[in-house]
Amino acid sequence: MTEEDRKLTVETETVEAPVANNLLLSNNSNVVAPNPSIPSASTSTSPLHREIVDDSVATANTTSNVVQHNLPTIDNNLMDSDATSHNQDHWHSDINRAGTSMSTSDIPTDLHLEHIGSVSSTNNNSNNALINHNPLSSHLSNPSSSLRNKKSSLLVASNPAFASDVELSKKKPAVISNNMPTSNIALYQTARSANIHGPSSTSASKAFRKASAFSNNTAPSTSNNIGSNTPPAPLLPLPSLSQQNKPKIIERPTMHVTNSREILLGENLLDDTKAKNAPANSTTHDNGPVANDGLRIPNHSNADDNENNNKMKKNKNINSGKNERNDDTSKICTTSTKTAPSTAPLGSTDNTQALTASVSSSNADNHNNNKKKTSSNNNGNNSNSASNKTNADIKNSNADLSASTSNNNAINDDSHESNSEKPTKADFFAARLATAVGENEISDSEETFVYESAANSTKNLIFPDSSSQQQQQQQQPPKQQQQQQNHGITSKISAPLLNNNKKLLSRLKNSRHISTGAILNNTIATISTNPNLNSNVMQNNNNLMSGHNHLDELSSIKQEPPHQLQQQQPPMDVQSVDSYTSDNPDSNVIAKSPDKRSSLVSLSKVSPHLLSSTSSNGNTISCPNVATNSQELEPNNDISTKKSLSNSTLRHSSANRNSNYGDNKRPLRTTVSKIFDSNPNGAPLRRYSGVPDHVNLEDYIEQPHNYPTMQNSVKKDEFYNSRNNKFPHGLNFYGDNNVIEEENNGDSSNVNRPQHTNLQHEFIPEDNESDENDIHSMFYYNHKNDLETKPLISDYGEDEDVDDYDRPNATFNSYYGSASNTHELPLHGRMPSRSNNDYYDFMVGNNTGNNNQLNEYTPLRMKRGQRHLSRTNNSIMNGSIHMNGNDDVTHSNINNNDIVGYSPHNFYSRKSPFVKVKNFLYLAFVISSLLMTGFILGFLLATNKELQDVDVVVMDNVISSSDELIFDITVSAFNPGFFSISVSQVDLDIFAKSSYLKCDSNGDCTVMEQERKILQITTNLSLVEESANNDISGGNIETVLLGTAKKLETPLKFQGGAFNRNYDVSVSSVKLLSPGSREAKHENDDDDDDDGDDGDDENNTNERQYKSKPNARDDKEDDTKKWKLLIKHDYELIVRGSMKYEVPFFNTQKSTAIQKDSMVHPGKK
C-alpha cells in the first residue's frame, strides 16, 4: 500500500480549539515538559486512524523492553521504529473507518478475559447522541470555548489510539470512580494488571503490545480526557522508502486524537461495558473494589452504606495515588526509549515539539486547578526531584518527559470539574443564536460565528533562553543547520456550534476535512519554565525531537552517535512562510505565535524566487527556500532563525505607531461580541458578520491609514501571474506582504546592516492581517469573486496652488520607477522613504512614452498643505525624517511626485473661481434667453394690432375716358406693430356728379348749356340767367355710378411704428374699366346712383327733348351715355368703401373704411 492510498482528502466543518491556557505555554515554574515519546491510550479510534495488526516479531521485543524497563540506545530505537514504520503488513485494509468504535479485537487479551469480560462492538446511542458527545460542541470542553466556521480542503490523516495511556490513567485510583468516566476505569485496570503480572507475564505483554506497535510505526500522540481543551492535530503518514525521490508534501504536526467525535463514541462503549464487567475483576474489601495491586477504588454504588468511611478512604487514597503516581515516573521513563518518534512530517515542525507544547499546556491547567490540594502538589514536586536523581544514568530528556507525563493525570479531576460548571448567560445566548442560524439550511445569508484564537495574543508569548539558543547555533555545522526547515501552522480551526441540531449534525457527518494546525512546539520555553531541569536535559530533548525534514536524513541519524545528534538541533521556533528571518546571534529573539494560516499544499507551491536567500559580507538575511523537490535548501553561510510576528502584535504596534491618525479601534466588533467582554472565564471575543465564509471582511476593510495600496487586487495578481511570478523594477508593490518581509530582528542599534545584492524589492511589515497576503492560504481571499476591486476610500480636496504637477516634465511613476533603481536598506530599523503610490502604478508604466500622458489611472492632486502633511507622515513612518540639532525637519529621499492614490471616490471638494463664473454665465444666459424669448413673444402679441387712423389723403392724376377711368389714391395710416402691413384687397365704389346734365322722368338727359344760349339770343338775357340759377339751386344735379373697384393695382404697405411711432403713407392706383356700363356695375351688386355727368339741368327744355323711350329701362342700367355727356364738363369724383388686410402671426383679417371726393376738370390741367 503506497502513501497515496493512505491519504484521504476530507472536507469538514473545521473546529477552533478551545482558547484556554493550554494553547500556548506560559511561564509557570510548575509546568513540566511532557514526554512526547510516550504514546497515550485512547478509548476509541480516530476518524482517519490506522490500526496496526499484532505482529509477534515486531512487537514482542518492544513489549518486553517496555515492561522490563530496558534502556536501548537511540540508534536501536530509531532503527526499530523505521523498520516497523515502512512495513506495509502492519496496516489494516480498512484504515479509514470513520465513526467505528473499538471492538474486542482492539483490546488486549488479558484485559478482555480477566477484567472486562466482553466489549460490545457497536453503540446503539452513538448516532443519536453524537452531538452530546461531540468534542466540537461547547458543553464538552470549556463552556467559553470558541468555534469558528470556515470551509477548506486539506490533506489530513490521524494516528490510532495509543495504549500507553494506561500508565497515565492509573495515577488517581481514589478519585477515578467518582469523577472520571467508566472508560478511564477500564484503562486504569488494564494498567494495574500489566504491573502486577510483572515483566515476564504474558498478559502484560499483551496489554502493552499495541502501544509498542503504535509507537514504532507512527509519531507520538498525546491523549487527554473528555474535558481536555487541546485542539486536534492530525498526523500524516510517512512515505515508503521507494518514494523518497518524489516531491515531498509538507504536512501538519501531531493531532490529539481525543478531540474527535469517534473517540467519544468508543468511550461510550467502554462506559457501558465496564459498568457490567468491572465488579467481576476486583475483590471487595470494606465496601469498595480493590485493584490487583492493592490500591482501593471506592465503589460509588456502595456509597450509601457507609458514607463517612468512603470520604475518609477517598482522601487517603488521593494522597496515596499522588505518591504512587510520582513514584511510577521511573517506570514510564523506560517506555520512552522504545516509543520515541521515528519520523516527523516533512517540512513541518517536530511532532514531539507539538506534543510538548500541548501536554505542557494541559499541565498548566493542572497546576492552576491543583492549587487547592497542597499535599498533592508537595508530593508531586518531591517526586519530580527524586525521579531526576534516580534516573541520572538515563537520558535527561526521558526523565523530563516522564515527569511531565505523570502530572498530566490530574487533568481527569480538573476537567470533570470544569465540565460540571454551568454555562453563563452569554454562552447560552450564543448557542441559541448559532442554533437559529444553523437551522435554516437553505439560508441565503450563510451567517457564521467567527472566533479569534488566543494563540495570536501577546499575553501568551513564550520567552526562550536566548543564551542557550545561541550556544546551539554556534555548535551546529552550517550544512546541518541549513537542512532544518520548520513550517509552523497556527492552531486556528473552526466549525459551526452544534447544540442538538440534527441538520448541522448531518452536515458534520459528510465528507469534509478538518483543518488543524500545530501548537507552538518550543521546547526551550518549556524547559525554561521548569527550574528542576538542568541544561543537559534540553540538549537531550533536542536529540529526540529534532525535525527530520527528509527521508534520507534517517540513515545519517541512525549512524551518528548521540553527541553528534546534539549538534543538529535548530533554533526552536515556529516558522511561517512569509515571516522574516535573520541570523544575528546577538539579537534577542522572542518566540511569537505564528501569523500565517497556510494550508499544507501551499507550502510546497510557494514561488522559489520569493523565497530566495541573499548573502553579503558574511551576514545573511534569508528566507526559507522551498524548492519543488524539497530535497535541500540553497546553501548559506549561516543558519537562519525565523521570527514570526503575530496578528495582534502587528496590530498593537501599528496602533501605537498610527495613534495620531485617529481612532484605531477595530470597527467590526458588534453587539454580540460585547456580551463576551465580561465573561470571567476568559473566553475570546466573538465577531459576528453576515458575509460568506470565503470573504475575510475584516482584512479587506481594515487598511492602513498611510498606505493607500489595496492588497490582493485582481489586476495585480493577474499582472504578477502573467509574468512568471516576477515583478519588474518599475512596479510599486511597496507594503505588500505577498513576498518575504525582511527586517533585522528589530535591532535598531545594529548599524552595520547587510546590503541586498539580488533582491528586486524591499518590503516592510505592515499592520494588516497576514491572512489576506498568503495567496496559497485557505483563508486567502483575492477579491476576484467581487464585482469590482475597490481600493482604499479616501477623500482629498483639489489642489488650488498647483506647483510641481504642472511642470511639463513631471512624471507620475513610483519610487521604483526611477532611473537609478537604487535599493536602500533600512537604517535604524526603518525603511527609506517611498512614493506613496497605489497598485495602479503599473498601468502607468515606466517608459518615457507614458511619463507625460494622463490617463484614467492618473490620480487627483492634493492641496499644498495636504501634500506636505502626507509627505511628513510617510517620511516619519519610513524613517526618512531626521531631527538635527536645531530641531529642523529635513526631508530626505522624498519624491516630489508624491501623489494621492487613485480612487473613484476622489473628487474636488471646492470649485475654482473660473468654474464659478462660468457656471454663473451659463445660468445667466439661460435665464436671459428665457426672458428675452418671453419678452419678444409678449411684445409681438402686444404690438400686432390693426391699422390706426387710416385716411385717403388725396386722389389725383385722374384720367377720364369713355372706356376707362384711372386715378391715384394716397392713403396714410399708423401701424402700432413691429412688422409691416400690406393692403391689396379693397371694396371701393366710384361715383361721378355733375350739374350740367338734365334728365327727365323717362331718363332722357340733355345738356342745359345749349338751351340757355338759345334763349339768351332770342329773349332778354336777365331773365335767362335768373331761370338758370333757379335750376341749379333747385337741385338739378345728376349723380352717376361708374362702377366698383375690388383690387388695387399696387398694394398699400404700412411700416411698423412700434419704436418710432410715426404715421406711414402709401400710394396706389385704382383702375375701372367701362365706367357706367352694366359689367362695371355688376362686379358689385350695389345699385348706387352715381353722378357722373357734369351738366346743367334746365327747366322744361331738356325734359321735353329727352322723353323717355320704349327702351328707357335698359338705358337706366346702362349709363354709358351719361358718362359720355359728363366727361365734357367738370364733375366731381367720389370714392367710398373699405380696405382689407391681415395682421402678422395672427392670420386674422381686418378692414377699415375710407371715403374721399375730388373735383375733376377735364379741359384743365
UniProtKB/Swiss-Prot annotation:
Q: Which GO terms describe its biological process?
A: 1-phosphatidyl-1D-myo-inositol 3,5-bisphosphate metabolic process; positive regulation of phosphatidylinositol biosynthetic process; protein localization to vacuolar membrane; regulation of phosphatidylinositol biosynthetic process; vacuole inheritance
The residues on the Vacuolar side of the membrane are 941-1165
InterPro entries given for it? Vac7
Which Gene Ontology terms of cellular component type are present? cytoplasm; fungal-type vacuole membrane; membrane; PAS complex; vacuolar membrane
Designated gene of the protein: VAC7
- Domain of life of the organism encoding this protein: Eukaryota
Q: Report the protein name in the record.
A: Vacuolar segregation protein 7
User: Compositional bias (Acidic residues) at which positions?
Assistant: 1085-1100
Q: How does it assemble?
A: Component of the PI(3,5)P2 regulatory complex, composed of ATG18, FIG4, FAB1, VAC14 and VAC7. VAC14 nucleates the assembly of the complex and serves as a scaffold.
Q: Where in the cell is it found?
A: Vacuole membrane
Q: Which spans does this entry mark as compositional bias, Polar residues?
A: 216-230, 346-367, 393-412, 576-587, 614-662
Q: Which residues carry this modification: Phosphoserine?
A: 164
Pfam family, any one: Vac7
Instruction: Report residues carrying sugar chains.
Output: 1020, 1099
Residue spans, topological domain Cytoplasmic = 1-919
